[in-house]
Design a protein with these regions (language model features):
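Active-site-proximal helix/loop segments of hydrolytic enzymes
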Residues: 4-103
Length: 103
């Protein structure tokens, strides 16, 4: 399963997003991805930085998007449709959030 975790990192020198938010978003993304993969047993494919996510361009707090798989991939689609695996996915995400906030 392909896992991607994205956060907004502006490509321009005159960014409207602070370095603190970018750094915190990177930490959030990396932490969530690590715990998500260790909980689900899925491969960690790394963090993808992307500045094309218009829905999160103006965030003032750490932000990340977790792609948990691709419905276009029959194996991933079947796994994500399984209620038992959905619970594992939720636990992995919760573990990452808890770790980020130091719980």
């Amino acid at each position: 399963m392909c896992i991607r975790d994205r956060f907004y990192a502006p490509s321009s020198a005159n960014s409207y997003l602070s370095a603190d938010v970018i750094s915190a978003s990177n930490t959030l993304a990396s932490t969530m991805l690590s715990f998500y993969c260790s909980t689900t047993g899925l491969a960690n494919k790394g963090v993808l930085q992307d500045d094309n996510m218009t829905g999160i361009n103006w965030c003032t707090i750490p932000v990340t998007i977790v792609e948990m798989g691709f419905m276009s991939n029959p194996e991933e689609d079947q796994k994500m449709a399984n209620p038992e695996f959905q619970a594992v996915i939720a636990q992995g995400l919760a573990n990452g959030i808890d770790a980020y906030f130091g719980r």
